[in-house]
Amino acid sequence: MPQWIRNSPLPAIQLALLILSAYFLVYRPSILTGALFILLLIRLFQQYGKKSALKVLPILMVFLALFSGHALKMKWEEERIPSSISQLSLRPDSIRINGDQLSFQGRSNGRNYQVFYKLKSQEEQAYFQNLQDLVILTVEAEISLPEEARNFNGFDYRAYLRTKEIYALVKVTEIQEIKARSSWNPMDWIFLGRRKALLHIARSFPSPMRHYMTGLLFGDLDKDFEEMEGIYSSLGIIHLFALSGMQVGFFIDKLRYLLLRLGLKRETVDRLQIPFSILYAGLTGLS
């Protein structure tokens, strides 16, 4: 456990609650989140006294500064969205096809975009359905901001995309050219490997087995699953298709067991868990 947590006068769970309230104060500012944060601070002073509470405040200030800096960065990114775009690097594992509608995540000039395109032919549809390469698209496109929640407590699409570091939508009107691209970014190759694995499972296994595999192993559920979601929900097995911390913990525990059985030292296994966790996060699409 980090030293600053061990030295905190608060139990870890209570410290986490304070940090969580600071997070919502910055990212979801409202009378409710502000009142909750103030109430927790009052309880902190009442329960632990001034001396102990003052030891916790620097930790809270650090997290408030980090959250505020990130929130300002997001606002700055939204204000700097370009008016036009001509090339997009396609992230292959994000491809979704619904009828003649194609969507995917793309990157251009260091920025991420959520991209939409109406397929012009069955050949185009088949190409993107089977795409297993890193490609760059030359396009004609329009850029817009995602919609915010229209109703109280409604779904905020803009806030959702912010969690993925996406600040703008791109509507492609024409794809002029598709070229293969190379990349030295290891995440590109992890995402490509994820795409190949998803396609292999989709072609090799029937429903609902492939939904189990893609959902539990890779955190991905396609359009076919959405059509069956109501049935799975009524049967009470919808949770079996969701990737959760329990499954991640299971895979990491099994990796530790295997490496320890192979004779590796515990310290070495602890170090290997870090790159494995990063690799697995990429294979789940950072979901």
Feature roles, as predicted:
Residues 1-80, 169, 179:
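N-terminal leader/targeting segments
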Residues 36-39, 99-104, 273:
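Short N-terminal signal/transit or membrane-insertion segments
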